Swiss-Prot record:
Ubiquitin-like modifier involved in autophagosomes formation. May mediate the delivery of the autophagosomes to the vacuole via the microtubule cytoskeleton. Its main location: membrane. The keyword Lyase does not apply. A lipid is attached at G118 (Phosphatidylethanolamine amidated glycine). Belongs to the ATG8 family. It is found in: Cytoplasmic vesicle, Autophagosome membrane; Vacuole membrane; Cytoplasm, Cytoskeleton. The C-terminal Gly is amidated with phosphatidylethanolamine by an activating system similar to that for ubiquitin. The lineage of its organism: Eukaryota, Viridiplantae, Streptophyta, Embryophyta, Tracheophyta. It is a lipid-anchor. This is Autophagy-related protein 8D. GO terms for molecular function: phosphatidylethanolamine binding.
Length: 118
């Protein structure tokens, strides 16, 4: 059974309260939600909520996601934020400041084996 998207599973108030608590407890980390693109044939993540260091490059976070998905070396993994591919050298804190959800405070990332949406 496919899990419901995080935004559908929890109310805006619940999500905002949770992200605020995470940031208060860990000010050097950002709250990130990682979900599979609906039409991707990649496996579902066991865990979709992450507390990521602000100074971690996007490429390092993608490496962590690859290992959690147990992907073979030849399997492509693309991570999108607002339907765009962030640069792998960009720091997660910078991506968060540019793309965080203003309503609930989480950064939403989507992963796929395809490089484009549509």
């Amino acid at each position: 059974m496919k899990p419901r998207p995080f935004k559908e599973e929890f109310t805006l108030e619940e999500r905002a309260k949770e992200s605020a608590a995470m940031i208060a407890s860990y000010p050097d980390r950002i709250p990130v939600i990682v979900e599979k693109f609906s039409r991707s044939n990649l496996p579902e993540m066991e865990k979709r909520k992450y507390l990521v260091p602000c100074n971690m490059p996007v490429g390092q976070f993608i490496f962590i996601l690859r290992s959690r998905l147990h992907l073979s070396p030849g399997t492509a993994l693309f991570v999108f934020v607002n339907n765009t591919l962030p640069q792998t050298a960009q720091l997660m804190g910078s991506v968060y400041e540019s793309y965080k959800d203003e309503g609930d405070g989480f950064l939403y990332l989507c992963y796929s084996s395809e490089k484009t949406f549509g």
